[in-house]
């Protein structure tokens, strides 16, 4: 999934900028970004909810609230693995639905920054050889400045 594909889902670049920042906060804690995959998608009654998915893959993510340390949001993304990405269809077409437990998580246009974070990581971030994390860059600058003698 390209960043352009992600922009078409988020409708705004703000959520994508936030996605990299949320990702950086989460890997800072234990060095990994954890996403759960539902193994029993055949047990889901998706058609009763108006969802037509050929080969469903349900993903769940967890993101800590930036504003309240005791609040964790759950993100659910439904992907149709049967969608073949080619010249006519891109990665966006394989995303059948998404939801987040945050106050803005059930948007009808675009998605919240939490959903954008998981989509960014799954579709783009994890395929990069290196992800520039703003905080690491700032930490290195502070270390370099701290090592210099003051006059």
Question: Which stretches of residues belong to each language-model region?
Answer:
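Long, low-complexity, compositionally biased intrinsically disordered regions
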Residues: 1-151
